[in-house]
Amino acid sequence: MSDEKSWFQEIHFLFPEGKDKALTFSYDDAQVYDRRLVSIFDQHDMKATFHLNSSTLDREGFVTRSEIKQLYVNHEIACHGVTHPFFNQLSQAQTVTELYEDRRALEQYSGRIVRGFSYPFGVYSDNLIETALKLGIVYSRTVNSTMDFALPTDFMRWNPTCHHDQVTDELLADFLNPPPFRGMALLYIWGHSYEFERDGKWAHIHGICEKLQGRKDIWYATNIEIYDYVTAVRGLIMSVDGHILYNASARPVWFMTSGKMYCLAAGEQMSFD
């Protein structure tokens, strides 16, 4: 083999518009405190994913079916099981029903395609993952904090950076001031909106948003937007010598090579001499 360094060894993929950081939030259970949390996110131009249990909608203390289309208009709606069950205590038939009916109901109420999921109580198994994939789920969030900013290797075992209680000034400083070798960095924060009310910590989420808002180097995205983009990056087709790159996906992909940034459009092929 040639000792010459291949072009593809120098490529550095980036988030949309050439940004090197991404931020996403994920909140479960759809209690009425989602209304206040959504307002805070919208005020600061944040993007989040809200995981809903379709059977609790309209119950006291929870958001209503009629409001979710407008309430979450700037955010993603995702599954959390019809009844928030312990999936390790269900039969296979119950597992299918919990996933399928939750997805069906949420799509009906929201008018959108629902593809995301988060594991109630953080409980999951290989069988649950296999079943979810067959039912059209493409990613699912755990409750296992990594305390880092790495992209997930397995979107069906998507470990977040941390719960919002674990967000510190030191963590944010590490995210915002990366070493040059880090590459694409994702800060993924999760929790429940009722925790801010219960613990008297609404100022905490306000502070997080204020420190992270309006930055030109951050892509503010929902969970499904992260999934779709990273999947597009990982699906790029490259020639053996690394001089031809083809984007077979339906979305543009950004990268840098030899000190120059490129945007490879959907369906585009690019050659480098």
Predicted features along the sequence, with ranges:
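Non-membrane alpha-helical structural segments and their capping/turn regions in soluble enzymes
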Residues: 92-97, 169, 199-202
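Metal-dependent polysaccharide deacetylase catalytic core of the NodB/CE4 family, i.e.
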Residues: 42-138, 144-158, 162, 184-193
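A short, Lys/Arg-enriched amphipathic alpha-helix followed by its capping loop at the start of a domain
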Residues: 40-46, 208-211
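C-terminal domain-boundary segment and adjacent tail
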Residues: 6-15, 107, 139-148, 181, ...
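Active-site metal-binding loops of divalent metal-dependent hydrolases
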Residues: 27-30, 81, 193, 223
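A short, acidic, amphipathic alpha-helical segment used as a generic capping/interface helix at domain edges
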Residues: 169-180
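Boundary/entry segment of secreted carbohydrate-active catalytic domains
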Residues: 1-35
